[in-house]
Regions:
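Short, glycine-/small- and polar/acidic-enriched structural segments
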Residues: 1-80, 84-86, 103, 109, ...
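Solvent-exposed, acidic/flexible segments
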Residues: 5, 29, 56, 60-64, ...
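Pocket-lining segment of extracytoplasmic ligand-binding domains
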Residues: 9-11, 19, 91-185
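Well-formed, non-transmembrane alpha-helical positions, independent of function
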Residues: 14, 48, 95-96, 114, ...
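Residues that flank catalytic or metal-binding motifs in active/ligand-binding sites
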Residues: 32, 50, 142-144, 237
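Short, surface-exposed acidic
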Residues: 78-82, 189-201, 231-238
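Secondary-structure end/capping motifs
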Residues: 153-227
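Conserved C-terminal helix/tail region of periplasmic/extracytoplasmic solute-binding proteins
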Residues: 218-245
Length: 245
């Protein structure tokens, strides 16, 4: 019943496969938001995680897939060389970090900023987007995409074009005027305005469509699928997955 949604990139592929093409991806809207954070200075490279236990949320989802892949590319195995204490919510990771002065966590924005607001000693140790590009120079770590129902595309193409035009403008507004956007984020109860003001510029919000979208997303999904086919619903979708490309 949903015509348009913003969801994790791998979930878009899974949904496309499971619904036999009921939704197409229209644009990328968020690039990397995943970071390794700590209160100390023990972590400066991925191999420093060996023998450590991290707090994280997202088991069976992008955080786990990304961490597992990057560890494997650096000669380590998740669950053997690096342990994770999985939490059901990112907020639980923030709470655990607040109680553990030696804690290390895998967190997305804006929860990194939330954690830092509670403890100014928490620092970003690793940017997983940078780590991803270090082993895949031609690929980007993609967090989110916007999907549109194939039926809406077929029945109301002009409405879809108008929607995407307004959406592109909205993204530009959030990127160019983060303080104003943060006011709206606070107003609608997404996260408090002070957190949003700090976090928004760090969230890698973007609007990428057409051929650039297809190139970046197909590369990203291909890498995920090679490591774990179930991460993308069994297989990387074909050309008909991409709207306007």
């Amino acid at each position: 019943d949903v015509d348009v949604a913003s969801i994790p990139a791998n979930l878009a592929a899974t949904l496309f496969n499971k619904t036999k093409g009921a939704y197409k991806v229209a644009c990328l809207n968020v690039l990397n938001v995943l970071y390794i954070v700590e209160t100390g200075s023990a972590i400066s490279k991925l191999t420093d995680l060996k023998g450590k236990t991290l707090y994280a949320s997202g088991k069976g989802a992008v955080p786990e897939y990304t961490l597992s892949y990057l560890l494997s590319k650096n000669g380590m195995t998740l669950g053997e060389d690096v342990q994770v204490e999985w939490k059901s919510e990112h907020t639980e990771c923030v709470a655990a970090l607040a109680q553990d002065p030696e804690g290390i966590a895998l967190l997305p924005q804006p929860f990194v900023t939330v954690a830092q607001s509670k403890n100014s000693q928490i620092r970003i140790a690793l940017d997983l987007g940078a780590e991803w590009e270090a082993v895949n120079p031609q690929s980007k770590l993609i967090a989110g995409v916007t999907i549109i129902s194939s039926k809406l595309i077929s029945d109301s193409p002009d409405a879809v074009t108008a929607l995407l035009s307004h959406y592109k403008d909205s993204v530009a507004f959030a990127v160019d005027h983060p303080d104003d956007a943060a006011t709206l984020v606070g107003k609608y109860g997404i996260v408090p305005e002070p957190i949003a003001k700090v976090a928004l510029p760090k969230c890698n919000i973007t609007y990428i469509d057409g051929a650039d979208m297809k190139s970046a997303l197909s590369s990203y999904l291909g890498i995920l699928a090679e490591a774990n086919p179930q991460a993308v619903g069994g297989q990387v979708p074909g050309d008909d997955f991409y709207f306007g490309a």
